[in-house]
Structures are given as C-alpha cells and as structure tokens.
Curated annotation (Swiss-Prot):
Residues 1-10, 27-36 have a biased composition (Gly residues). GO terms for cellular component: nucleus. Pfam families: QLQ, WRC. This is Growth-regulating factor 8. It is found in: Nucleus. The lineage of its organism: Eukaryota, Viridiplantae, Streptophyta, Embryophyta, Tracheophyta. It comes from Oryza sativa subsp. japonica (Rice).
Length: 409
C-alpha cells in the first residue's frame, strides 16, 4: 500500500511540518479509480481498493501477477512473481528450486517458505471465486536432498541400521557396530540368552592290576596278641606312601645281611618287593614301638591288622633303618631262618612251613615278665627263640645268642 497526499492533481508530497496541521480537501481519482483518502493521526492515507484478479488461462502453479487497479498509482499486494518473469513459486514441473532459495526472507527455512507460498496460492483462488485445483489440495512432497536436506525417515525406521540397538535400559544406544546381519554387537549378542554349563567329562578311573603277591606280616591285634599271618591275595596293588621311606627300582637280594640296633621307642620303615616280574616297590607305613607298664612288645607288619579285616599285601620284607648307636636294649641280630606263628596255631602248626623267612630285627627281648604260663623254645643255628605268653595275654618273643646270654628264664 502506498500513502500519499496530492495537491492540485499533481501528487507532490508535502513536508511533514505542513502536513501536521494541514488538511487535504481534495480527492484525486484517476481513471475511474476506486481510491479513498482518510486522515489517521494527522496523516492522509490513501487506501487503494484492489479489484479481484481475473484468473488467467494458465494455471496458478505458473507465474502469476496480481496488481491493484487504480488511477495513476496503486498499491501492490503480495506478489509471488519473480522480477525476471521466471516461475517464482517453483511448484510447477518446470519450477526452479534455486528461485525458491533466492526468495527466502526472514527467519523462514526453505521448506517453510514453500509451504507459505502454497497456502497463499490456495487463498488467492478462494478470494477470486475460482475452483482450487486438486494439485494444490494434495500435499506437496518435494525432496530437498540435492541441496543438503535429506529425506527424514519415519519414526519406526532405524536411522543407523548398522549400529547396535542395545540400550541397556538407558537413553543412548550402544556405540558399537552390529555383527553381520544381527541387531547387536559382539558384546550384547549373547546378553539375553541363558548361559549353559560347560560339559565336564568324567574322569576315568585307572586301576593298576598286579600279580598276586605274598606278604608275611607280624602285627599286634586289638587283643594285644602278636599275630603272624600268611595270605594269598589276588587283586589290585595298593601303594601306601610314606615320606620317610625310600623307594628304589633295583631288586633287593634275598640274602642281604642287615645289622640294626633297635630301641623300644624307635619307628621302622619297611619296604616290600612283590613277586611280580616287574619288581615294583611298595612303601609301607612305619610302625611304632610301644612300651607300657614295663613290658615291651614289638608289632611289625605291612599294615595294622585290625578287626575291620583290612587287606594286607604279602611280600618279603626288608628292614631299612638308620643305625642307632645308643640303645638300652639294642642287640646285634643276624638274619636267620626262623619260624613265625600266631596264637591260634601256636601248638598245632608250629612245625609246618619250616622254610619261611623271617625278617631280621622283628623280635625284641622283653625287659620284664610277670609270670610265664607257657613257653616254647626253638634252636636254630646257635640262636634261641623263646615264645612266652604272659598272664596279661601278650605274646612276646625274644631271640638271644647263647654266647651272650648263657641262661634262660
């Protein structure tokens, strides 16, 4: 709109000082004009009444111009035509997007400016009483991707399809890339699965089967009797480990002279060799000597012969012990052929198996006898062996050299 004050039909503007108190009484109209002058706040304002634009033969999607009809001068309404006469809207098929970007004014974005022009065209058709084309009623879908505005994906689409989708209950997603065609990365791909236990293979129990062996055992039973048993055992070979025993892979000679000096409170280390061809060594646990109530008795064996019936493996025993210099009852014993017996077969089977080998150093001379109920004496190679049974039920045996001890009890 244009505001002017005319004088004498020439339309020359007055100065502000003259217009402040002056009043223009004449009205100018040119060419059957429909102009009208009003006084607002001391100013003469000429309102131009625009006639409704006649729709041209071409569509409004092209370049259109709207002008106000008025004599001499007229106000110009919102025009969408470009100065050079090109398609200003850019909404037609031949429209240029660069023209839209060139006309962007104010704080509007190119998309908002296109929407504003689109609504202005619809309004112009309504104001001209012209039917609005269907192309304007349909939403305009125009991509701005070549100029840097990509198409916005819908909310259901993934903006970063190659990124791990795990959020771990937080606002932000995992920053790692997904594995292959999966949704998650290597860290989160197995997060929701149940962890299965690892398969544990059962340990195979290996049994060492050896040939039957023979063990001569002399031990103290729960009743206090010295028992010598001989058993034939068939089965697996057991190894009893002892930190004080020495194992060797060499074959022990049967006729080995061992000189030991014994003490009542000493412990013995026995090692036995099996009769099998591989000559494996079996380390036996040591036995302690007991000395109670001034009565000394020695229990020797390949294991404790308790009433539980624990299996005793039988083999030839060889006494290996460090030499003790000082012993109150120590004597020098030589390995000789002797005969061992138990309390059950003391009188019946005394003469059987005369060739059994008895280990040296397993008999100890008793220090005191209260009373003797029965006794047996066997002479073998100048060595006297006397088996005595005391009133307490202990079977004791003493072996002495007749040259050293001339008399017996």
């Amino acid at each position: 709109m244009l505001s002017s004050c005319g004088g004498h039909g020439h339309g020359n503007p007055r100065s502000l000082q003259e217009e402040h108190h002056g009043r223009c009484g004449e009205q100018q109209g040119g060419g059957g004009g429909g102009g009208q002058e009003q006084e607002q706040d001391g100013f003469l304002v000429r309102e131009a009444r625009a006639s409704p634009p006649s729709p041209s033969s071409s569509s409004f999607l092209g370049s259109t111009s709207s002008s106000c009809s008025g004599g001499g001068g007229g106000g110009q309404m919102l025009s969408f035509s470009s100065p050079n006469g090109t398609a200003g809207l850019g909404l037609s098929s031949g429209g240029s997007m660069q023209g839209v970007l060139a006309r962007v004014r104010g704080p509007f974005t190119p998309t908002q400016w296109m929407e504003l022009e689109h609504q202005a065209l619809i309004y112009k058709h309504i104001a001209a009483n012209v039917s609005v084309p269907s192309s304007l009623l349909l939403p305009i879908r125009r991509s701005l991707h070549p100029w840097g505005w990509g198409s916005f994906p819908p909310g259901c689409a993934d903006v970063e399809p190659r990124r791990c989708r795990r959020t771990d209950g937080k606002k932000w997603r995992c920053s790692r890339d997904a594995v292959g065609d999966q949704k998650y990365c290597e860290r989160h791909i197995n997060r929701g699965r149940h962890r299965s236990r690892k398969h544990v293979e059962g340990r195979k129990a290996t049994l060492t089967i050896a040939e039957p062996s023979t063990v001569i055992a002399a031990g103290v039973s729960s009743r206090g009797h010295t028992v010598a048993r001989q058993k034939q055992v068939k089965g697996s070979a057991a190894t009893v480990s002892d930190p004080f025993s020495r194992q060797s892979n060499r074959k022990f000679l049967e006729k080995q002279n061992v000189v030991d000096q014994l003490s009542p409170m000493d412990s013995f280390d026995f090692s036995s060799t099996q009769s099998s061809p591989n000559y494996d060594n079996v380390a036996l646990s040591p036995l302690k000597l007991h000395h109670d109530h001034d009565e000394s008795y020695i229990g020797h064996g390949a294991g404790s012969s308790s009433e539980k019936g624990s299996m005793m493996y039988e083999s030839r025993l060889t006494v290996s012990k460090e030499t003790l210099d000082d012993g109150p009852l120590g004597e020098v014993f030589k390995r000789k052929n002797c005969q061992s017996a138990s309390t059950e077969i003391l009188t019946e089977k005394w003469t059987e198996n005369p060739n059994l080998h008895c280990p040296s150093g397993i008999l100890q001379m008793a220090t005191k006898f209260n009373s003797i109920s029965s006794g047996n004496t066997v002479n073998s190679g100048g060595t006297a062996v006397e088996n005595l049974i005391t009133d307490n039920g202990y079977l004791t045996a003493r072996m002495m050299n007749p040259h050293i001890v001339p008399t017996l009890l």
